[in-house]
Amino acid sequence: MDNIERLYKCYEILSEAGDKISEHVDEYKEILKAVKGTSKEKRLASQFIGNFFKHFPDLADTAIDAQFDLCEDDDTQIRRQAIKDLPKLCQGNADATIRVGDTLAQLLILDDPTELQQVNNSLLAIIKLDTKSSIAGLFQQISTGDETTRERCLKFIATKLLTMGPTVITKEIEDYIVEEIKKALQDVTADEFHLCMTILGATKLGSTITGHAELVKLATEQAELNNTDADIIAVDDEVVERFIQCASAAAPYFSKTIKSTAFVAHVCDKLLPIKTWNMIATAVSQDQIQLRLLKVFAEMITNTDKLDNASERINAVYNVLLEYMPLPKLSDEDLGDTPPSFQFSHAECLLYALHTLGKNHPNSLSFVEDAEKLKDFRARLQYLARGTQGYIKKLEESLKGKTGEELKTEENQLKQTALKTTSNINILIRDLFHSPPIFKHDIVLSWIVPKNNKLGKRHAPITFGEKAAANGKDKDQEPEKKSRPSNDQKFYSPPSGKYSNKVNQSYGNNNRTRQRGGGGGGGSGGGYRNRRFNKY
């Protein structure tokens, strides 16, 4: 009898043994040994191991390891079969479910789409069998795995687990997820922080005022607002990036009840002083980093309490605004054929911030009390208004007569956003040009999509120059398609570890140093090449 026939015979004996199946240990051991056999033997072993697993508890560890061996076989078909059969080990066995969940979590880093789909299917299957034990395996990898594994696990939770509905995500399970994600926040990279806050926002925390307050508290703790000074900010891009990430995570939850005062005060005190402002991100895309900072600042400022030292803080906004409001040319001849050049997106944010703070602190606008400063400010406003109105006219002419389909093109979408930006600037200038300024108009920031979209959409920054009239952007300007850096934008490589002093000096290579037990695959590099997952 050859090995294949012997395997079928063992299967037949075990299937027909009934209550006496536990007496047939030798037959089950023979099936386990088949994981070292030919391809066909391995595929049969994968199918048979799980069928009889629960009847041989003394061989549980051996059986699980045998199945795991098949999950890392050189043959793709055998790996897929073994991954598909893993859920059979989990029926009524919490310990096995945790181990299988841990293994499948590690396999989320697979690149082959067919294999990865099978991993997802098997994970979803065991989650339906025993939700808590399954996701305990996921959180083991979030705690001890390498960076890629951690990120894939968090993405799985955000995009698949939390969409499984209340029959799976019960109150107990949701509480467990919240507790474990909070633990994970103790040591996260920038991308992991974003994923963790996305997950928490999709739980009960995202739907109640008390939950919003807790989310803001978590973001505030990560931002470490009291632990940075101007000298550090000037030389360390990570500090600014950390603030932008944390402020962006908190921004959707600020309201009349939950105030953004601490974040706004931090921007005014630590980031907007001119010396510091001009040093921000000098080694990378400075305009883009500064614009991202200004956007989140503008989003937060509406929900600020009365500021202490309001005059000094408003003056910090005013001084940076002047950087984006050039003085007018001496005469029309000086202009020649070159239109004035403005960074409208930056100007919108700063004008809105000044307008909002001025409305809340009308007696703290120190430049209004200085005749020379007020004259200078009004001259700059008038010059900006001139450039804005000229740009609005060209944009309106460019968009006139366009069909609905034509307006959906990227170029025309950009022009429409530019029109919103410049229209907002025009409205704000009208109020601020009064002597003294008035604050009667309210606007919606150009990149915010009101209703049903807390976070809003970010659009490309806008400049005014030779190419602007044609396509709504400077010839050297690339659209800012995301509100935070991605692998494509390469504004900045986030460092390893928590947003604190635990920064790996070689963070530019995206390595991660962790003082943890274990690791995603039994080694500092995750061990993927030698072994895809940990054995117990």
UniProtKB/Swiss-Prot annotation:
One of its GO terms (molecular function) is RNA binding. GO terms for biological process: apoptotic process; negative regulation of apoptotic process. Transmembrane segments: none annotated. The keyword Protease does not apply. It holds the Pfam family API5. Belongs to the API5 family. This is Apoptosis inhibitor 5 homolog. It comes from Drosophila melanogaster (Fruit fly).
